[in-house]
């Protein structure tokens, strides 16, 4: 199953861009809702993509919307950095990973600026994706909201399986009445979420995302 690791970023996105692109380590980039957008690639051309300073554009967007300001006395979470690591057993190629990463990012963050950078700097040379999502919602002007963060990983698992890749099933087979009674006698049935978390911890894919309870004002 693919592993999704979310990391909260604070401050400028310049630091994360330098980290992701230093030394020519980036295999490829995909950009959305910036001065270059992959969906307009034919009209914009490769030169426009190379010229896109996505970190500076994200910083400017947050400044324009005022989403850099502290929230309830805490430093602003200026961006989210998701590391999407495919299952090594899938032997995924870069093109397949790019399609999966872009589809997942746009499904959940279509109203945000997105930069995806791909690496293969691990022991087995397996490509993986670094997905950087700016905190400002371009449609509402509010900071990023993830009302159901568990859906981020659930959707990734479903999308992987739809593409013939390994993925954790989000469906549980029905239990027999006797098995259900036995589980209840042992402390009650475990929820699908608790089952998933137990397995995910073993796979080092536990998601922990802290979100505000309501949209924050500009």
For each feature predicted by the language model, list its residue ranges.
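N-terminal nicking endonuclease/strand-transfer module with a His-rich metal-binding environment
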Residues: 1-206, 210
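Positively charged, low-complexity/disordered segments
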Residues: 211-214, 218
């Amino acid at each position: 199953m693919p592993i999704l690791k979310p990391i909260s970023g604070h401050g400028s996105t310049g630091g994360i861009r330098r980290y992701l692109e230093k030394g020519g380590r980036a295999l490829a980039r995909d950009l959305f809702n910036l001065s270059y957008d992959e969906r307009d690639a034919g009209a914009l051309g490769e030169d426009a993509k190379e010229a896109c300073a996505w970190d500076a554009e994200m910083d400017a967007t947050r400044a324009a919307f005022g989403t850099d300001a502290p929230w309830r006395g805490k430093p602003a979470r200026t961006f989210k950095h998701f590391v999407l690591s495919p299952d090594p057993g899938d032997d995924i190629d870069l093109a397949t990973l790019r399609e999966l990463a872009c589809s997942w990012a746009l499904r959940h963050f279509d109203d945000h600026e997105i930069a995806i950078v791909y690496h293969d700097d691990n022991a087995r040379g397996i490509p993986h994706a670094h997905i950087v999502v700016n905190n400002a919602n371009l449609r509402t002007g509010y900071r990023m909201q993830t009302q159901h963060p568990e859906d981020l990983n659930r959707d990734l698992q479903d999308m992987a399986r739809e593409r013939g890749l390994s993925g954790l099933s989000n469906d549980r087979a029905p239990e027999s009445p006797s098995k259900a009674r036995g589980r209840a006698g042992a402390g009650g049935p475990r929820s699908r979420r608790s089952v998933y978390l137990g397995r995910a911890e073993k796979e080092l894919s536990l998601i922990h995302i802290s979100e505000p309870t309501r949209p924050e004002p500009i």
